[in-house]
Every structure is written in structure tokens, then in C-alpha cells.
């Protein structure tokens, strides 16, 4: 279109106005003659030239003399070649086109926009014929092309930093059914694209020496212009050859919204994907300008050859689309993604890769033009939909820019899918998976991405080293967290659901602390040894199903059990267990720990919290003595858990083991320990199950020893002397063979008031109760060598009343009653 503007002469002299008018008429006649010559030499543009002649003849009749009628009169027909002469100082003005070959009513209905200069000038260069003079001057065309070339070269550099991209505005409109303006522009016919091309004001560049980045085409440009106020008036979108970009981006229908999915389960994304200014896409390295012009000419002359070359994914495609094919943005790991949001990828079916070998459209890769940390984007042919798909790969695998062989491409694609969990997008709305085809909902921010490279979830720990998780998180691509079961010094235990077996299990998540991680490895080793000796769990030790290292957190999967005997006791308001239930639980505990001792393994952390019911269902009944309801567990089958502190005889023995309330005296006095320390702990447990209270409720070593003497009698002199001679601790608890303890102090009065001899704690003088306390007294012997072994305990009269169906296994009389040699236990426990 040609810019025109006529002004009324302001001179007072009529002669000067007449002279100027004659000068204008001469120029118009000269221009008309030139246009007539151009008409005879041009055959392709006969129709447009005839219109121009009509317009010029109409202008010569004198309409240009009146400035009011000039704005409505002579104009030139709109064409794509003349649209490039629109200056920055021009604004579009709707006018009517005059065509003598068409009816007047039809011409009045057609409205077009013609840009006229802004401002006033007395020069005649702003007359309507100035546009035709520029068309005839070839030097001005070359000068204009050079300016465009310099303008594009200046835009190849990065832009200034801009505000944070807000994807929600576009995502919300997309989810409400708003179509993509980029897709609308690409699917329009060529003549409609020219008519609908927006005439926007050119953005004036600042005086800064930092150049701007090239305008982005497509969806990236749409998001940039709608989310950045600084670039609200950006450069207009440059046109692309029809049918080029839809094939490159895999679009088939602008009405159908794209869907994303995962290679395995198709779980939807759950977090927003927003990128800061440091993670913006970088510009693509373009070819030289003369090569670009050559390819553009080849496209116009040979459209069929262009389509064939585009299907081969050669270098020519990059040069032909240098201004509308920006480099794919670099995607960094999303720091807000949750662990369960990304299921474990599986290998693609070999049939799909065999189909890709048969097609020449195998791969097209672009190496990352920026620094490290970015990813490479490519195109992949889909034989089912006859479209091309984007795929993302990590930066480590995109260093090679040369085309690869089909077999190497298959291996690389499989490794990339396994390592980076790449998501392949089909913009037609269909996702191809080996086992299922499922369309998933997308997160709001993911709607604005052509492709996305999924990253490994970022694992966060709290100040104590516990793993931060939420209900519904999926660990190790298999175990879905359902609830938290308990917490300890080692970590937490959660209830998980095995997604493969559809079965609930218990998952022990160890703290991300070195000492607890090493202890977990020892526990796994002990559980594996136990599984070798007892594959069917006949000896009542918990069964380990699986284990794995989850980002520094050792995780062990166990069978799902019920409450611990301590938790059930606490929920029952510390109402003690009936004696028959205590007998059955004590028998199972002795039987299970004896199995460990027979295999030269010491548990070292026996307590009610580590004894779990297989099923903690209960019945309630009213107790008239205490005037309230009490619970009674239905099934007293138990399992032994927590082998984190289990120690083999040949392994290093820590100085302090066991929980305070169940710690044996040889451990407190640092005289060495072995299997008898477990027997002491079992004696304390039986007392607690029987009475519902802890036998030694203290947190101080000296007070603990004072309670022992108050309940069990004086500590032997030999142990006191050995403690004084061999103990490495600076604190000495004995003076001249006696415990250094002030009974008149507040702590001494507390021990005297709350502790009493063991046999005075019996609830009844019946034979059953006396047999239980007899067993407890033998388990609480000071001397480890004098302490009863678990083999002997299983033959204690207290277990004679146990029903046959409660006996796990008959203990043969021919087997040694002790769990190992008594001399070995005594020598090891008193090795100092």
C-alpha cells in the first residue's frame, strides 16, 4: 500500500501557488507515463497496473487539488510487496478504493487501511506518487533490504531481563476453550494471513548498547507479548510458508487442545512449571543472509521441491525458516515438582522403533546453543498419525550435532527416556504408550509449553534429617504413602500401598544422617541373614520384603503388622494384659530371641515398642473394679522388629546399647555385653506387660543403679570393683565396693517411695503369678553368667500352662538348653 498525504498551500501569493500546482501536475504526468511503460513490459501484474492507471487518471482530473477529497480519493491497491514500506510515523486510516471495473456500491463496502504520514510539510515528497517512485527506484529497494538485514542482525542478541513470566493468564484462557492465536495464524490461508497481519507500532530501541533479542514466533511470542508489559508492542509476526510450521510443530487441528502424558502410567502433572529470567530460551544461531535469501527464492519457485526437502530434515530447513524457527528453549529441572508426580518410565516397544527405521523421518537434533545445563530438542516421526513429535533430551546427550544411525538413535532414545523421564507430546491430542493410551489433564502452566523435559523430583529434608513427604507421594515409582504409623530416633514408619501388587505394607524411612544410614545397612544385612536361616518366618521375626536407597534415605519395606504392645497398652490407659496373654507373648518373645542367639546375633534393643501384634483388633468389656471399659486384644500373635542395633558376635560392640529403661547393669557399668543383655530386657518387658508400668523409670545411671538395689538387692562386689578398675568413664558409681548414693536427697527419697522389692509387686499369690515372678527374677540376675538363658526359660514352669496351639515349636530335650555355650557367654560378657 502507498502512503499519501496532501496539504493545502499556506502561501499568500497566488503566483507561487500556481507555480507549485503546475510542478505537481508535471510530476503526475511523468509518473503516469512511467506507469504506462511498466504496464506494457509486465505481463503478470496486468490487473494491478490497470487499477493503478485508473487511479492515476482519476488523480489527474484535479482531485488532488482539494485536500478534503484527497483523503477519500486516489489510493493504490493493497499488496504484500508494498506493505513493507509502512514507516514508524504512519498510522492506518480506513479509505475506500476506487475501481472503475467494479460497481460503486461494492467498492464502498470494501474497507482497507492506508497509512498516511503524521505531521505537516511543504515538500512535495509526501504526495501519492512518492510510493510509485520508490517502486521504480531499485536502489531504494536495496537500501531498504540492507536496513532490514541490519535490523535482524541486531535482534540476534539476548534481550534485557524482563519480569517473571506468569503462565496462569494464558493457561486459564486455554482451559476455558480459548484457541491459540499462533495456531490460528499458521492455519490461515496465505491471503488471509496478509490481510489479518496486525499493523503494530514499531518499538523504538533504547540508547543502550545492549541489543534486543529476535522476536519469537508462535506460542512463545504470544506468551511473551501477553505477560511482559515491557514488550507489549513487539515486532509483528513474520509470515511462514503455508504448511511449514504445522508440520514442524505437529499441529493438525487448532480446535483440538494438546494433551500431555507420561510414558508409563499417565499420571497428571500436579505442579506449576514457571521459568525465571535466567531460564529464558536463547536465540538460535542463524545462517548467513545471502544463503537465507537463496532458500527463500527457491521456496517461491519450487514449492514441491521445498516440501520434499522439508521432509528430509536437512540443514536447508533451518536456513529457510531462520526467522520463524527459534531454538527450542532450555528446560531446567522444575524445583517444585513433587516425587510422586513422575512415575517410573518403561522401555518403549521395539515395534515402534522398527517402524521408525522404515521411514526416512528418523530424527532431527539441534545442539544447545547456550551454556551447559540446557537440553536439546528434536523432532520424531510418528508412523501412526503421520505427524512429527517433539522430544526432549538432557544436555549431556545432545553434544553430538551430526546425524546418527537408526540403531544408535534407538539406543539413545531408550536411554534418554529411562534417565530423564522425557515426555513425548503429540499435539493432535493423542499419546502413544506401549501398554495404554490415555489422555490426561494438564496443569495450568504446562499448557503453555510445546514440550517439557520432566526432571527428577527434588527431595527435601527437615532440620532433623527426616524426609519431607505428603500423603499420596509415590516413592521408588512403586510405593504410595497412605499414612504415618510412627516415628523414632532412626526415622519414620509409614503405611504404603504397593502399586504393583495392590497390597499395603510398612515402609521404614531412615533419616538422611550418616550414622542412621550405616545402622540401616547393618539392619538390612541382619535381616538378609535371618531370611537365609528362616525363609518362611517360622521364628517370628519380621519379614523384609524390599529395600532401596531413596536420595540418601535408606528405605526398608516390611509386611504390614498391627500396633505394638506398648501402643495398645497406652491406648488402653495402661491397663495391664491378662496373665494368659502375658504368657503367650512371653513365650513367643523368648522363642524368637533364642533364634537370634543361636545364630550368634544380639538384638540389643528389645522393648515393648519393638514387639508388634500381627493383628491388633480387640474387644471391649466393662471392668467393674475400675468402673470403665477396657480393651482386650483378640489375637496375641506377635512379631519382633527393629534390627537396626542387632550385632553379631564377630562385629564391633558399642559401649552403650539398649533403651535406658531396659538396659542391663553390665552395659551401664561398661563391663562388656553379649546375649544376656537381651534376657535382662525381656525380664523388664514381662514386668511391664504384667503391671502396665515401667520397672525402672529413670534417666540417670546412678539413680538407675539405686533402683536396681532397691528392687533386686545389692549389686555384687565383683561388678563394682571391675567397674572401678576397667571402666573408661570418669564417673565412678561405687566407693569402696558400695554404691555412692545419698538416700536422704530428693532423688533418694523418690527411689525409696516409688520402688519396692520385686516380689512385693505381685498382684496375687497364686501359683501362676509366683511362677511369672520367678522367671522374671532369674532374668534380672546381676551377673550375666548367672542369668537364665532363653533356652532354659522356654522350659520354665511358667510356660507349662501354655495351650498346645500357642506353642510355635517343640523344644527338643536333646538340644542344649542354653542358646550357645554358657562359658562363651560368660567369657564374652566379662571380657574386661
Swiss-Prot record:
Highest taxon above the source species: Eukaryota
Region described as Disordered: 1-86, 135-158, 179-215, 258-419, 809-832
MF terms (GO), sorted A to Z: ATP binding; protein kinase activity; protein serine kinase activity; protein serine/threonine kinase activity; protein serine/threonine/tyrosine kinase activity; protein tyrosine kinase activity
EC number: 2.7.12.1
Domain Protein kinase: 479-799
UniProt catalytic activity: L-seryl-[protein] + ATP = O-phospho-L-seryl-[protein] + ADP + H(+); L-threonyl-[protein] + ATP = O-phospho-L-threonyl-[protein] + ADP + H(+); L-tyrosyl-[protein] + ATP = O-phospho-L-tyrosyl-[protein] + ADP + H(+)
Active site, UniProt feature: 605 (proton acceptor)
Post-translational modification remark: Autophosphorylated on serine, threonine and tyrosine residues.
Keywords: ATP-binding, Cytoplasm, Developmental protein, Kinase, Nucleotide-binding, Nucleus, Phosphoprotein, Sensory transduction, Serine/threonine-protein kinase, Transferase, Tyrosine-protein kinase, Vision
InterPro entries: CLK_kinases, Kinase-like_dom_sf, Prot_kinase_dom, Protein_kinase_ATP_BS, Ser/Thr_kinase_AS
Biased composition (Basic and acidic residues): 20-32, 823-832
Tissue expression per record: Ubiquitous expression in embryos. Stage 17 embryos show elevated expression in CNS and brain. Ubiquitous expression in larval imaginal disks. Increased expression posterior to the eye-antennal disk morphogenetic furrow.
Cofactor(s) for this UniProt protein: Mg(2+)
Gene Ontology CC annotations of this record: cytoplasm; cytosol; endoplasmic reticulum; nucleus
Residues annotated as binding ATP: 485-493, 508
Pfam family, one: Pkinase
Amino acid composition bias (Polar residues), ranges on this chain: 8-18, 271-282
Family assignment from sequence similarity: Belongs to the protein kinase superfamily. CMGC Ser/Thr protein kinase family. Lammer subfamily.
Its biological purpose: Dual specificity kinase involved in the negative regulation of microtubule-based transport through phsophorylation of the microtuble-binding protein eEF1gamma. May function in the control of alternative splicing by phosphorylating serine/arginine-rich splicing factors, the SR proteins, including x16. Negative regulator of the copia retrotransposon element of the white (w) gene. In the eye, it is required for normal pigmentation, photoreceptor cell development and for organization of interommatidial bristles. Also essential for embryonic segmentation and differentiation of the nervous system.
Subunit comment: Interacts (via N-terminus) with x16 (via Arg/Ser-rich region). Interacts with eEF1gamma (via C-terminus); the interaction is probably direct, is transient and leads to phosphorylation of eEF1gamma by Doa.
This protein's name: Serine/threonine-protein kinase Doa
Amino acid at each position: 500500500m502507498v502512503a499519501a498525504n496532501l496539504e493545502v498551500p499556506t502561501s499568500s501569493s497566488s503566483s507561487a501557488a500556481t507555480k507549485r500546482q503546475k510542478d505537481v501536475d508535471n510530476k503526475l504526468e511523468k509518473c503516469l507515463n512511467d506507469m504506462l511503460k511498466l504496464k506494457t513490459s509486465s505481463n503478470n501484474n496486468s490487473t494491478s497496473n490497470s487499477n493503478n492507471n485508473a487511479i492515476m487518471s482519476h488523480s489527474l482530473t484535479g482531485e488532488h487539488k482539494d485536500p478534503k477529497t484527497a483523503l477519500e480519493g486516489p489510493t493504490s491497491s493493497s499488496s504484500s510487496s508494498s506493505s513493507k514500506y509502512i514507516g514508524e510515523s504512519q498510522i492506518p486510516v480506513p479509505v475506500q478504493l476506487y475501481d472503475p471495473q467494479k460497481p460503486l456500491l461494492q467498492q464502498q463496502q470494501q474497507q482497507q487501511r492506508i497509512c498516511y504520514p503524521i505531521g505537516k510539510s511543504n515538500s512535495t515528497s509526501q504526495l501519492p506518487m512518492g510510493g510509485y517512485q520508490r517502486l521504480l527506484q531499485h536502489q531504494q529497494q536495496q537500501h531498504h533490504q540492507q536496513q532490514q538485514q541490519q535490523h535482524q542482525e541486531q535482534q540476534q542478541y539476548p534481550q534485557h531481563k524482563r519480569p517473571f513470566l506468569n503462565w496462569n493468564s494464558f493457561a486459564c484462557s486455554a482451559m476455558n476453550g480459548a484457541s491459540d492465536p499462533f495456531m490460528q495464524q499458521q492455519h490461515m490461508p496465505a491471503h488471509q494471513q496478509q490481510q489479518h497481519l496486525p499493523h503494530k507500532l514499531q518499538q523504538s530501541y533504547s540508547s543502550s548498547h545492549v541489543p534486543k533479542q529476535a522476536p519469537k514466533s508462535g506460542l512463545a511470542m504470544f506468551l511473551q507479548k501477553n505477560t511482559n508489559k515491557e514488550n507489549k508492542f513487539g515486532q509483528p509476526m513474520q509470515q511462514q510458508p503455508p504448511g511449514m510450521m504445522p508440520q514442524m510443530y505437529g499441529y493438525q487441528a487448532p480446535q483440538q487442545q494438546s494433551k500431555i502424558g507420561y510414558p508409563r502410567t499417565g499420571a497428571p502433572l500436579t505442579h506449576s512449571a514457571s521459568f525465571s529470567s535466567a531460564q529464558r530460551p536463547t536465540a538460535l544461531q542463524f545462517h548467513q543472509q545471502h544463503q537465507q535469501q537463496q532458500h527463500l527464492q527457491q521456496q517461491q519457485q519450487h514449492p514441491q521441491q521445498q516440501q520434499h526437502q522439508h521432509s528430509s530434515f536437512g540443514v536447508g530447513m533451518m536456513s529457510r525458516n531462520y526467522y520463524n524457527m527459534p531454538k527450542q528453549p532450555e528446560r531446567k529441572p522444575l524445583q517444585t515438582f513433587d516425587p510422586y508426580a513422575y512415575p517410573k518410565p518403561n522401555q518403549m516397544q521395539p515395534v515402534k522403533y522398527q517402524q521408525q527405521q522404515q521411514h526416512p523421518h528418523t530424527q532431527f537434533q539441534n545442539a544447545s546453543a547456550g551454556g551447559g545445563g540446557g537440553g536439546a530438542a528434536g523432532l520424531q516421526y510418528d508412523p501412526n498419525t503421520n505427524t512429527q513429535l517433539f522430544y526432549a533430551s538432557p544436555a549431556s546427550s545432545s553434544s553430538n550435532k551430526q546425524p546418527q544411525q537408526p540403531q544408535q538413535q534407538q539406543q539413545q532414545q531408550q536411554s534418554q527416556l529411562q534417565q530423564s523421564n522425557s515426555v513425548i507430546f503429540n499435539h493432535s491430542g493423542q499419546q502413544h504408550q506401549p501398554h495404554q493410551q490415555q489422555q490426561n489433564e494438564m496443569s495450568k502452566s504446562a499448557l503453555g509449553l510445546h514440550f517439557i523435559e520432566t526432571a527428577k523430583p527434588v527431595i527435601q529434608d527437615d532440620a532433623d534429617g527426616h524426609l519431607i513427604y505428603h500423603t499420596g507421594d509415590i516413592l521408588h515409582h512403586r510405593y504410595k504413602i497412605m499414612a504415618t504409623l510412627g516415628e523414632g530416633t532412626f526415622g519414620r514408619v509409614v503405611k504404603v500401598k504397593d502399586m504393583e501388587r495392590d497390597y499395603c505394607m510398612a515402609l521404614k524411612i531412615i533419616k538422611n544422617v550418616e550414622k542412621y544410614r550405616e545402622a540401616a545397612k547393618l539392619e538390612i544385612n541382619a535381616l538378609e541373614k535371618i531370611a537365609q536361616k528362616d525363609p518362611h518366618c517360622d521364628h517370628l521375626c519380621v519379614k523384609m520384603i524390599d529395600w532401596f536407597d531413596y536420595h540418601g534415605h535408606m528405605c526398608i519395606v516390611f509386611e504390614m503388622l498391627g500396633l505394638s504392645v506398648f501402643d495398645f497398652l497406652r491406648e488402653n490407659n495402661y491397663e495391664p494384659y491378662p496373665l494368659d496373654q502375658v504368657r503367650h507373648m512371653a513365650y513367643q518373645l523368648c522363642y524368637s530371641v533364642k533364634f537370634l542367639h543361636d545364630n550368634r546375633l544380639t538384638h540389643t534393643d528389645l522393648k515393648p515398642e519393638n514387639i508388634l501384634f500381627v493383628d491388633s483388633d480387640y474387644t471391649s468389656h466393662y471392668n467393674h473394679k475400675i468402673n470403665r471399659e477396657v480393651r482386650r486384644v483378640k489375637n496375641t500373635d506377635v512379631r519382633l522388629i527393629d534390627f537396626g542395633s542387632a550385632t553379631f558376635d564377630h562385629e564391633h560392640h558399642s559401649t552403650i546399647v539398649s533403651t535406658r529403661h531396659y538396659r542391663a547393669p553390665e552395659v551401664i557399668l561398661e563391663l562388656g555385653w553379649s546375649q544376656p543383655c537381651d534376657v535382662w530386657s525381656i525380664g523388664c518387658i514381662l514386668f511391664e506387660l504384667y503391671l502396665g508400668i515401667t520397672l525402672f523409670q529413670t534417666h540417670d545411671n546412678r539413680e538407675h543403679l539405686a533402683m536396681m538395689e532397691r528392687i533386686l538387692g545389692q549389686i555384687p562386689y565383683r561388678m563394682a570393683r571391675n567397674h572401678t578398675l576397667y571402666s573408661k568413664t570418669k564417673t565412678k558409681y561405687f566407693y569402696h565396693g558400695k554404691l555412692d548414693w545419698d538416700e536422704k536427697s530428693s532423688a533418694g527419697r523418690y527411689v525409696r517411695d516409688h520402688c519396692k522389692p520385686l516380689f512385693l509387686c505381685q498382684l496375687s499369690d497364686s501359683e501362676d503369678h509366683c511362677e511369672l515372678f520367678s522367671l522374671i527374677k532369674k532374668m534380672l540376675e546381676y551377673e550375666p553368667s548367672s542369668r537364665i538363658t532363653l533356652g532354659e526359660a522356654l522350659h520354665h514352669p511358667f510356660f507349662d500352662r501354655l495351650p498346645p496351639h500357642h506353642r510355635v515349636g517343640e523344644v527338643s530335650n536333646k538340644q542344649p538348653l542354653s542358646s550357645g555355650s554358657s562359658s562363651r557367654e560368660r567369657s564374652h560378657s566379662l571380657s574386661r
